[in-house]
């Protein structure tokens, strides 16, 4: 069985007599192919508004229609903002937090020294004074304002800490009795006794008396 050509030339070359032989179908049924003609060497489908579909082409069209439907549904969902990538959920959740983080300004030693010196003289600055100080230090007015606020808070916290410190030192100390085991016959030595012990203690500590030797008197010998 040869395949029927669906080219435009073949459709236009068909005569009007073949139109009467077309059989229309109701619903989704496709009309059966007509009997082959004698003057044509191959089978042709009669001309119709919608040419019949082969099983392969019908399957391809059905798949393409399904893909188009999915693509339209995904596009509509993405436009409504409901479609989100699960892998990018954490990044989307963290993006507002990262945008809210502010970079901390780093001051040089000269700037900190000048700010400290000005703070020791004046803790509160007016608008013009703040602008002049910021211009001289090459800073913004916001940076100078925030630095003075933090410095005042730090000073206040130190003051509160110093005020609460004496109260803790006034707490009465408790005396705790400690038992010391000392024998009754044991003598307690003072530091002075340890440095210069008395002779009496050494005398009593000596166990034996010294021996006394009696020597005869020396008598000179006179020559006779």
From Swiss-Prot:
Start-end of DNA-binding region: 100-159
Gene Ontology CC annotation, any one: nucleus
Any GO MF annotation of the entry: RNA polymerase II cis-regulatory region sequence-specific DNA binding
Residue stretches of biased makeup (Polar residues): 77-87
Keyword Nucleus: yes
Pfam families in the cross-refs: Homeodomain (PF00046)
Family of the protein in this entry: Belongs to the NK-3 homeobox family.
Gene3D superfamilies (UniProt xref): Homeodomain-like
Protein name: Homeobox protein zampogna
Keywords: Developmental protein, DNA-binding, Homeobox, Nucleus
Keyword Transmembrane: no
Compositionally biased intervals (Basic and acidic residues): 55-76
Gene Ontology annotations of biological process type: cell differentiation; positive regulation of transcription by RNA polymerase II; regulation of transcription by RNA polymerase II
Tissues expressing this chain: At early tailbud stage, expressed in the pharyngeal endoderm, concentrated within the pharyngeal clefts. Also expressed in the mesenchymal head cells in the future infrarostral cartilage. Beginning at the mid-tailbud stage, expressed in the muscular layer of the midgut.
Compartment(s) where it occurs, according to its Swiss-Prot or TrEMBL record: Nucleus
Region (Disordered): 1-107
Superkingdom of this protein's organism: Eukaryota
More details: Based on similarity to Drosophila 'bagpipe/bap', the name 'zampogna' was chosen after an Italian musical instrument related to the Scottish bagpipe.
